Swiss-Prot record:
Source species, domain of life: Bacteria
Cited InterPro entries: Pup_ligase, Pup_ligase/deamidase
Name of this chain's protein: Pup--protein ligase
Enzyme class (EC, first level): ligase
Function per UniProt: Catalyzes the covalent attachment of the prokaryotic ubiquitin-like protein modifier Pup to the proteasomal substrate proteins, thereby targeting them for proteasomal degradation. This tagging system is termed pupylation. The ligation reaction involves the side-chain carboxylate of the C-terminal glutamate of Pup and the side-chain amino group of a substrate lysine.
Gene expressing this chain: pafA
Positions of Mg(2+) binding: E17, Y64, E72
UniProt KW keywords: ATP-binding, Ligase, Magnesium, Metal-binding, Nucleotide-binding, Ubl conjugation pathway
């Protein structure tokens, strides 16, 4: 384990990429827009304001249309758990505002229609789209070696943070479990692994790697999201520190992830490479109990404070205990799949279905409506507004995160640069690493350390734009 002892990130750069499902329901007999056309209407204001449908915005995030006309929001670099949840939720608000503007444009043009955005991972045809987690790790880490200790956790993690789904008339804990085909791979779509190893650190490649986890479900619940990200951060810390001594490697990772998704009790035995087997929920308990011990020696440094991590571990252990005792009611305010299942159970009773029958169309409608992000319309937003589910952060944090980049990471520099460029209508381009002023003479800098939130070179770029503001035309594209 010596290879992990050199760097333990208790302050870790983390980000989440969310692809949203989109559909447009026309008014009465008017023509219905396809998803691709609805997405183009939605991104019209983005193109008008920034000159592209693939942009970085002043809160530090990337906003773009992904393959298959899925609006995608990639959060800015965050270095604490609550910060990340705020910027993830900010993405929901930003894309929903675009959807509402699209509805206004459709009405103005006499087309009409309601644009629906779903924070889920499956469409009605069974196509899967993702919620990708990004964790900064040291270049010292060999991802395939790390994967051997991380995969048992990620495969069983769906029990504590799955979004729940009806597939083929059956309830499953996870929406993504049936749509991954490898444990660790450099592919993303063709074979779709649990951990993607493509080497794109978006930082100094001599110092950092980006661990790209693509197996997770999109979460509506803040507490579920906090448990998903917080538990993973703690497991990574323990792996880096050499604090995980047990061997829980699974004999067949893909068979296991599918079987676990179909067993809400978590008690189905999972075969291990060692030749024994263990219930999935027991594997989670092993990790959670190790995390509780780890917190005693972790140290309260920058990033997510120990008090918040203790809150994560407490929720983690409580969730495991509730699943072990089949007390799903205890999870019905905190864990997405259990919240959804409790709603489906009520609907089954109203319809007259048995608890094992999920074939009724109204259940599928409820399954989808749970993920509608529109306040006052989506099922989960209504639960949240009625205080029927628990929160991790508050609305003020989310609103601020829609406008201002995280102040503690590199994103602050990008946000400051983009805000100034927008005000000055300067011709610029930006990505995760680079900031560029295109004219009069190209000026470019690279920000290779995602932990740094100050840099004199950014101040110089902004001064350069101000000095040449008179030469910038009003139709300049910002990309």
């Amino acid at each position: 384990m010596g290879e992990y002892e050199r760097t333990v990130f208790t302050r870790r750069i983390t980000g989440v990429e969310t692809e949203y499902g989109i559909t447009c329901v026309g008014d009465n007999s008017r023509r219905r827009l396809g998803a691709d056309e609805a997405a183009r209407y939605m991104f019209r204001p983005v193109v008008e304001e920034w000159g592209s449908s693939n942009v970085f915005i002043p809160n530090g995030a990337r906003l773009y249309l992904d393959v298959g006309s899925h609006p995608e929001y990639a959060s800015a670099e965050c270095d604490s758990l609550s910060q990340l949840i705020a910027y993830d939720r900010a993405g929901d608000k930003i894309v929903d505002q675009l959807a509402q503007r699209a509805e206004t444009a459709l009405a103005t043009e006499g087309i009409g229609g309601r644009v629906y955005l779903f924070k889920n991972n499956l469409d009605s045809l069974g196509n899967s789209y993702g919620c990708h987690e990004n964790y900064l790790v040291s270049r010292d880490v060999v991802l395939k070696t790390l994967g051997r200790q991380l995969l048992p956790f990620l495969i069983t993690r769906q029990l504590i943070c799955g979004a729940g789904s009806i597939q083929d008339g059956q309830f499953q804990v996870s929406q993504r479990a049936d749509h991954v085909w490898e444990g660790v791979s450099s592919a993303t779509t063709r074979s779709r692994p649990i951990i993607n190893t493509r080497d794109e650190p978006h930082a100094d490649s001599h110092r950092f790697r980006r661990l790209h986890v693509i197996v997770g479900d999109s979460n509506m619940s803040e507490t579920t999201c906090a448990l998903k990200i917080g538990s993973t951060q703690l497991v990574l810390e323990m792996i880096e520190a050499g604090a995980l001594s047990h061997d829980l490697e699974l004999s067949n990772e893909i068979a296991a992830i599918r079987e676990i998704s179909r067993d809400i009790t978590g008690m189905a035995p999972v075969p291990l490479k060692a030749g024994t087997s263990m219930p999935a929920i027991e594997i989670q308990r092993r990790y959670a109990e190790k995390a509780l011990c780890w917190l005693e020696q972790r140290g309260d440094t920058e990033g997510t404070p120990n008090a918040e991590m203790h809150k994560v571990v407490s929720l983690w252990l409580d969730t495991i205990s509730a699943i072990e005792s089949n007390d799903l009611q205890a999870l019905s305010r905190d864990i997405d799949w259990a919240i959804k299942l409790s709603l489906l159970r009520r609907a089954q009773r109203r319809i007259g279905c048995s608890e094992s029958d999920f074939t009724h169309p109204k259940l599928a409608q409820l399954d989808l409506a749970y993920h509608d992000i529109r306040a006052g319309r989506g099922v989960f937003p209504v639960l949240e507004s009625k205080q029927l589910v628990n929160r991790w952060i508050n609305d003020t944090d989310i609103e601020q995160a829609t406008r201002i980049a995280p102040s503690t990471t590199r994103a602050a520099l990008r946000g400051e640069f983009l805000t100034a460029a927008k005000k000055l209508q300067a011709p610029i381009s930006a990505d995760w690493l680079r900031l560029k002023v295109n004219r009069p003479e190209p000026q470019i800098i690279e920000l290779t350390d995602p932990f740094e939130n100050t840099d004199d070179r950014v101040d110089q770029l902004i001064s350069y734009m101000r000095n040449h503001a008179a030469s910038y035309s009003t139709d300049t594209a910002i990309s």
